[in-house]
Amino acid sequence: MAKRDYYEVLGVGKNASDDEIKKAYRKLAMKYHPDRNPDSKEAEDKFKEAKEAYEMLSDAEKKAAYDQYGHAGVDPNMAGGFGAGGAGFGGGFAEAFGDIFGDIFGQAQGQGGRRGGGPQMYRGADLRYSMEITLEQAAHGYDTQIRVPHWDECDHCHGKGAEPGSSVETCPTCHGAGQVRVSQGFFTMQQTCPKCHGSGKYIPKPCTKCHGQGKLKSQKTLEVKIPAGIDEGMRIRSSGNGEPGINGGPPGDLYVEIHIKQHAVFERDGDDLHCQMPISFATAAIGGDIEVPTLGGRASFTVPEGTQAGKTFRLRGKGIKGVRSGYAGDLYVHINIETPVKLTEHQKDLLKQFDKSVHEGGSRHSPQEQSWLDKVKNFFSS
């Protein structure tokens, strides 16, 4: 099958800059990399095609030959061809991605590893700890302790991983390098040694207590300081308290993820608080002083006369002091007018008399009701 034009493969024009060619290749390689598409032959073919195109167009000499003669100028089976070569991940692939690709697909670059001979070092995995706290603790701050998984040196083999009296040998597969070269088609790549898993060592007789790991799992107590104003989903990082590194690599970090319990009175919206405040019909009509709950205690508030159901009042600075802004939010009080229940006959008579007197006053006492009645009349008369 005829090869596609290299510029077409990468989706760039013939006047594309080196940077544009590199960006286009990175995008395609990320999309079709075998680690992301383990069972897709089509993705594997597209990955190889993009890699070949990049290797040609990123090399000035090969690019010039391709621009002048097309595939004939670079095909090793044709006279004068340069050939795709066998650069593998050490050539165009590594050049284009550096440690970015290593972070995604677990290569040593960018993870505390080192290139060249010898076992590869890997950064330990990060740990996540989910912690649930109250709204009050989130608002005011909170010091606590947590217990997290921890690894201690095995007291039987003293961290060697081998049964006492036995030795640790150089891995016969990778000869201590920690990696092996694997050929795939026209290029090769390095992979972690399947026998020693990157350590470069082989333990014929593993420790019977730690099973060759050289460490034992335990629990560790950590002090955690929850800052005032922390919000739902925020994370606190504890550096170096994640999983231990491999082959001398640095440990990962511990992330404490905060979840806030539902509160009986308040709902939080960022640094603001909302609460529903039931008041009596009489207080809504003639006004009065009420006590409003806040996280700092009770606050007095005067309800103006004629307050309608659903009215919202804002109490400035009665919310939560933001962990980032440093300023306190506001408290929004939503008024709910409570309808009295289980009335006595005397109370019912009084309300009927009151209702009659209100209606005799016309729209002066019930402007919203009168406005609604006018709209209804207009609807039926139209």
Curated annotation (Swiss-Prot):
Zn(2+) 1 binds at C154, C157, C207, C210. It is found in: Cytoplasm. Residues 5-70 form the J domain. Keywords: Chaperone, Cytoplasm, DNA replication, Metal-binding, Repeat, Stress response, Zinc, Zinc-finger. PROSITE patterns: DNAJ_1 (PS00636), DNAJ_2 (PS50076), ZF_CR (PS51188). Its cofactor is Zn(2+). GO terms for biological process: chaperone cofactor-dependent protein refolding; DNA replication; protein refolding; response to heat. Binds 2 Zn(2+) ions per monomer. A zinc finger (CR-type) spans 141-219. The keyword Cytoplasm applies. Pfam families: DnaJ, DnaJ_C, DnaJ_CXXCXGXG. The keyword Transcription does not apply. Zn(2+) 2 binds at C171, C174, C193, C196. GO terms for molecular function: ATP binding; heat shock protein binding; unfolded protein binding; zinc ion binding. CXXCXGXG motif repeats lie at residues 154-161, 171-178, 193-200, 207-214. GO terms for cellular component: cytoplasm. InterPro entries: DnaJ, DnaJ_C, DnaJ_domain, DnaJ_domain_CS, HSP40/DnaJ_pept-bd, HSP_DnaJ_Cys-rich_dom, HSP_DnaJ_Cys-rich_dom_sf, J_dom_sf. It comes from the Bacteria. Homodimer. Participates actively in the response to hyperosmotic and heat shock by preventing the aggregation of stress-denatured proteins and by disaggregating proteins, also in an autonomous, DnaK-independent fashion. Unfolded proteins bind initially to DnaJ; upon interaction with the DnaJ-bound protein, DnaK hydrolyzes its bound ATP, resulting in the formation of a stable complex. GrpE releases ADP from DnaK; ATP binding to DnaK triggers the release of the substrate protein, thus completing the reaction cycle. Belongs to the DnaJ family. The J domain is necessary and sufficient to stimulate DnaK ATPase activity. Zinc center 1 plays an important role in the autonomous, DnaK-independent chaperone activity of DnaJ. Zinc center 2 is essential for interaction with DnaK and for DnaJ activity. This is Chaperone protein DnaJ. The gene is dnaJ.
